Amino acid sequence: MSDTLNRLAEVLEERKQAAPDSSYVASLYHKGLNKILEKLGEESIETIIAAKDAATSKDYSDVIYETADLWFHSLVMLSALGQHPQAVLDELERRFGLSGHDEKAARQPSA
């Protein structure tokens, strides 16, 4: 899985330097973080709706498709912020073996 994420991260980085009319991702970067976040919000809602539909229909194709869009746009957001997908994988790895309640209790309150 990390090979796919690494390849995608490389492409996303390349698109930062591309002309806005050369690709969808380049156009998102050109429009700025707010547009990327707007798109991420849209994809979140679409994923939720697809999951609700899948729960009753037992057809999971749309929820898989929408989840891929959500992950993709999350990676675009991280890239726009100068972060690599490996940071998320590292955080998930850190959480293995840690109770969700313990992890939440260990967080520092934000100021």
Curated annotation (Swiss-Prot):
Assigned protein family: Belongs to the PRA-PH family.
Tell me its EC number(s), please.
Answer: 3.6.1.31
- Per its UniProt entry, which superkingdom is the organism in? Bacteria
| Compartments (UniProt record) | Cytoplasm
Instruction: Answer whether the UniProt record assigns the keyword Kinase to this protein.
Output: no
Q: Please give the chief subcellular localization of this protein.
A: cytoplasm
**Which pathway, metabolic or otherwise, does it act in?**
Amino-acid biosynthesis; L-histidine biosynthesis; L-histidine from 5-phospho-alpha-D-ribose 1-diphosphate: step 2/9
Q: What is the lineage of its organism?
A: Bacteria, Pseudomonadati, Pseudomonadota, Gammaproteobacteria, Pseudomonadales
Q: Its GO CC terms?
A: cytoplasm
Q: Which UniProt keywords apply?
A: Amino-acid biosynthesis, ATP-binding, Cytoplasm, Histidine biosynthesis, Hydrolase, Nucleotide-binding
- Residue pairs linked by disulfide bridges in the UniProt entry: none
A Pfam family it matches: PRA-PH
| Gene3D superfamilies according to UniProt | MazG-like
Q: Which reaction does it catalyse?
A: 1-(5-phospho-beta-D-ribosyl)-ATP + H2O = 1-(5-phospho-beta-D-ribosyl)-5'-AMP + diphosphate + H(+)
Return the protein name: Phosphoribosyl-ATP pyrophosphatase
Where would one find coiled-coil regions in this protein?
Answer: none
- Example of a GO biological process term: L-histidine biosynthetic process
Task: Write down the NCBIfam families for this protein, in alphabetical order.
Answer: histidine_hisI, PRK00400.1-3
Q: What class of enzyme is it?
A: hydrolase
Q: What is the organism field in this record?
A: Pseudomonas entomophila (strain L48)
What terms describe the molecular function in GO for this protein?
A: ATP binding; phosphoribosyl-ATP diphosphatase activity
